[in-house]
Amino acid sequence: MSIMSISLHSASSDTVSLTSRRTISTSKHWAAIFDERIYQICNIVHPGLPIDNAAVEHIRYFLQSIVFELIEARATSVVEVDKTAKKLFAFGLQTVCKEAWDNMHQQLQKHKYQKALKTVLESQHRLAAVIKETLGPREKEKKDREKKEIERIACYIYYACESVTEDVLRLTGNYVKNIRNSEQKITMANLDVAMNGDKALMELRTKLRNEEEAESPGGFGFLSEFEEFVAEETEEKTLSNSQTYESVAVDFLRDERRFIRELNRINVFRRRIESVAATDVDKQIVCNLFGNLTEIHDLALKIERTLEDAIELSDTQCIGMGIWEHGEAYEFDTYTFYIRRDGGEMNETRHATYVINDNIKALLESERFASLFQSGEHYLGSSLDGQSFRLAVQYVLPQLLHIPIFHIYQYHEYITRLHQLSSSEEDRRDLNDCRSAFERVVGCVSDMSPELKTKITQFLDQQAKSEKIYNVKRLNEIQSSIDGFTGSPIGKTCNELEKDGDLGMIRPSLQFSSEITKNKKWKTERFVYIFDQMIVLCKRHRNTLKFKDRLAVHSIDVFDIPDSEVTNCFKIESHDKSSLPKIYHFVCKNPEEKRQWMAVLVKVTTKSVLDRILDNHEKEEAKRIPLVVPGPDQYRFSEPDTEDNISFEDYTSSSGIPVIKCGTVLKLIERLTYHSYTDSKYILTFLISYRSFCTPNDLFSLLLERFNIPTPKKLQQPKQGGGPLAGRYDTVQSHGLSAISSSSCINPLCEQKFRKEFQQPIQLRVLSVINQWVKLHWYDFQCDPVLLDALELFLNRCCDPREGLSKQHKKFCKTILALIEKRVKNPPGIMQQPNENGDKGAADEGHVNSAFVFGDDQQHPPQHQVYTNESPKETNQVLWHTAQKGDVDHYDLLTLHPIEIGRQLTLLHSDLYRAIQPIELVEAAWTKAEKWRKSPQLLRLTDHSTLLTYWVSRSIVETESLEERMAMFNRVLEVMSVFEELHNFTGLVAFYSALNSSCIFRLKWCWDGLDNEKKKCFDRFNTLCERRWQEMQKRLSSINPPCIPFFGHYLSNIYFLEQGNSTFVNKSPPHGAAGAQKQQKDDLKASDPENSNKQFKQLVSFLKLRKISNVIREIQIFQDQRYSLTLEPTIRQFFESINPKNDFKSNEDLEEYLYNKSLEIQPKGLDTPTAELKPKHNASTLRSPGVKPPKAAGNHYSANHPIGLHLHSQNSHSAPHAMSSQSSTVPNTPLSAHETKRSLSHNQDDAPLQQFVDIRFERKGTHPKIPVLQPPPLLPRSSRANQSNSVSLPPTTQAPMPPAPKSSGMMSTATSPTTLTTTTTPSSAGGPPPKLHPRRMTQQPMSPLAKSPLTPSRDNSSPSAFQFPVVYEASTAPPLPPRPSTSSDVSSSPSTSGSTSSATKENQEQLRVIFDREESHSPTVRLSVPLPPALPPPRGSSVFRAPPPLPPKSNRHNSNSPTLSSEQPFEDPMSPSIFVNTPPPPLPPKTYRSSNK
């Protein structure tokens, strides 16, 4: 049976036993009692160490078993429960009962409960309900009398469970931190190993189970991960890595800390023995036994600090100088005094070994110490009963007392190795002096006890082997050498071999007695292996070992047999429940051999108990030494937590870290760099959203202030030195002294604790936050050179040795400086591409701008115009229909291959989507006045989506042939299917919006001509784009990147979170729109630099910021991966150049034109089509090539996943992150009286569109405007010239193009593009439709990122990545060209275009697609939708469920409405006057449609 199955059986057996014990409540009820407290205790014991949900569940089951065991006896008083608990926790966990009793009385004595006890009290009330149900119905008098008693019982049991949880988590956390090559997280496997490695917990688990258990302690041992590890390679690697001065110093420090822990273990014995030493004779025995260990402990602490300072703070090799300072003071003579003891009747000098043996013998034989070995109730409530403690004193304590002697040789060895590796002559000289001092002590040991050298050599070998992972090979070799070995593998159960050898054993068939030796065959031979968790008994047979038995260490007891019965004999008794009790009597050859075997056996059986006592001792010492921090007058971040400056959620994170609800800026910065833990999720959220309440300069100033921690005033007092016995850990409890001056011993330790636990952790976390800031949000420094210079100055100053920072701090600073240098030379997202000659020039830049960089410094490898997630192995073939490559003038919806249209648009949308940065989404920046500066990439994506919708609509309505229009309808649906397969929901919604526009949706002849397959396809798209986008959210949660989600859903969520919640928390905020406006004014005042102090005192709603950041992180999920598709430059250029709005003064004019064209091709009231016109395209063009790529072509998809009209099941893809379905703000329009719902559409929701104009950014003195490109005309070039047109067309007055400004700044004159000039054609009512004016040049394919404000345009390369401009307070915003205004705006004069009323109208503008509006009132797409209130109505109200319908727009042909005249002057959108005087309108949120309309 494997260890995995055993450990899983252990967890399941707990559950089964729980079920068999009358399970009263559900697991959800027990989770409410224990889970939250488990997380909190984990954070207290091991701050920042996460714990797995499975581990929490296992601990909960364990605590449930304890509760049922305590209440199963149906006790009616706390005293009875306490007696039951003492029986249950009889071995090793007696502190549980004591702490539970003390905490219960402490809680009951309080009359007013603090807020912190709220969760505890609620859990106790739930536990009391369980106890009441267990006790059953009672009489009323007894019920009233027992009511308070039951509450006390619940309180006692609850605190007992807390104490057990603390022990389990502390033990498991220590195991996780010490294990190598393991995830720093408490998992189920780690928890099982740690609990099975502790004897006390194993005994408790054995008592709680009803089933029989496997004999193995189970669990995945530390060495089980290295079964295939090669010992020789590991040893060679370890030795090679250790041959440096720094690595030897680190090993030296590790062993010194281990030595200090062993001294503390000796102190555990000393404190217990001193507790019963009353007379002077007894005190003299104790003094002679332990000698001057206090001075040795004090010297070890000094050497530990010396090594720490030399490793962390010094850049030079100076260990010799620090240690020799102690040597010059003759402090190493302390070891000489410890080895040479003054004792005996003649006060002669004796060796420590003899003195230790004599005093232990006197201690064991003294009647005054007899009570120490009889009672089970002792100091610290230790689990060692009388007999166990006697064996520990007799066999374990002598070995511990010899460790200081062994440690002298470790000193000598490390000093010698450092002397060989040191490159400093001064350090070598000091190390040589230290070595001479230690050699004198070593010589003293050799002269007095030559036989001790053997023990010292064995000790040093064991210490060295304990560090080698290749021990697992030794364990596997031992197991393979045992014939017939059964049970779990040794390597998965044990970590090291303690001792092995031959032992005589009394035959089990004989009855043990003092006369047994008279039998000739009374003894047999056994070869015994003692591991840390197991004893294996074997028998030699020729040249092999036969397996006989195995005993678990946690289930055995060791007994010493007096020599009066059998000489040199001891007994091992096993109490494993899986089999009958086993008793083995072993006989040794001599007393020394017996002492060695007994010492090892007692050590392995009592190790967990001694460790537990030692942990309690160290915890008590840690409480005695307070953590002194600067006061609020010295350090603003030391202000205590109150309700006025910070508040937390009622729940905690999975790692036990409290979740912040709101707090002041200072408190947010404090928790951002907290000394006890690191919350990575909080750091990411803070860096995304901090601009809502402070500027980057403010954040950097606060981080600098947080980094510069002053020394507390209490630690600045002059230190008072104590006497030679005033050691740092010298306590009243340890020596029984009446009074000791605390200033001499506590002050140095307080200073060390302040530096280790407060100052250094905070400084490291500040550097960590700066590192994340530079790595993930480089644009803050890119657009502010002053901030970047200040950061570099700070990091260079930290690297200065005079600052006294540790090496870890300096290394961190150098890493950040290297990252800054890399960002400056090669900003994130810029990648070089081969030029025409195949070389990668320095100025050549790629298309993709990776807005979010994950990892150290993600730079994508150069690719030959291929966008891929990984290194391209196989790229798809570009597919062509009837259009020829490079003939851009003939590209349209029918001539291009539908698959290639979907691919190239997907690549374009992917670049636009991935270029969006978090700063563009914070505070709904796309709706503010400076939206084109703050959210350029976001607006570029929505702008292109809107243009694509208009392009599809115009392509259809300008096609006069019905056959050709039906082919376009089919082609649009095919492209949408390609979008669906490529997970491009942005393109899919754009095409869907075109089909649902009023001018296309009314084309009944085209819709009726679709076959059933196409109708089903459209119905599927209609469901996918339904009102609340629920189906699309389900689709997103079940697919893997790459993907391009529809961005409007995210914008709606962010907008309502911004408008519906205030950034700053007020005591009683006003409600409604007026309250929101007042709060926005308060936020603006708070952001004013003059009110920065006031701002830092306001409470920031971090709950709101966390929700917004969660939405942004959902966006980031799909920004990290790209498509493995081949870029076709000419098709990319074509779709970048489309501009169906270039001939119209406003969007309404374009929409009116589209609707009139729709009426022309299908007049109202005409049910059947008239005479069919001849298509302009030939039959091969009209015939669809299909959407299944050829098999020979390499494709992004597998062969069994073709692109087709039918969407394959997406459930096969695993969802990286489930995305919540939230209500969209898509406006819908009621059906007209003349039209009915179409059967092929299940939902007539409008697709949200956004209106944008191709805005050109210009910064004075930097670079020229981006040129205009020539798109292909959508109208026939010759055949339509003579055709009559009854539809009135908008005027086609040609506005003069502004000249290109002179290049300066980053652009040179040679690289400045020139604009194209076009001739004007007078328009007439009967003339042909206007041709599309050019928007961009056609020489080079353009990237969507080329329109960034600071990005220059180059002739032979793609434009660079986006860079934010530097905005100074004194400078004005760059002039922005206008977007086409509404008719009301056109009629207004330029002088009033910047007025308040005009701005208000522009802010209320939003593009909506209305496909079911009554024709007599709304013949086209409507604009000018009013904004909803700033604060949305409360959820659940009637207003929220059914907002009022939008009022219909007045008829455009009404005489009262403003009209456009051909004589009316119209300025071009690129005109400089409009560029300055007309600010662009922001994008308001979308509105709801009434469900009952």
Curated annotation (Swiss-Prot):
What does UniProt give as GO cellular component?
Answer: plasma membrane
What residue spans carry the Low complexity bias annotation? 1308-1326, 1381-1400
Name it.
Answer: Son of sevenless homolog
What is one Gene Ontology biological process annotated in the Swiss-Prot or TrEMBL record?
epidermal growth factor receptor signaling pathway
Without the gene, what phenotype results? RNAi-mediated knockdown results in 8% early larval lethality of the progeny. Surviving animals display slow growth, thin body morphology and both spermatogenesis and oogenesis are arrested at the pachytene stage of meiosis I. In addition, males have short and crumpled spicules. RNAi-mediated knockdown prevents multi-vulva induction in let60 n1046, let-23 sa62 or lin-15 n765 mutants and fluid accumulation in clr-1 e1745ts mutant.
How this chain assembles, per its entry, is: Interacts with cmd-1 in the presence of Ca(2+).
Q: Where is the N-terminal Ras-GEF domain?
A: 656-824
UniProt entry tagged with the keyword Phosphoprotein: no
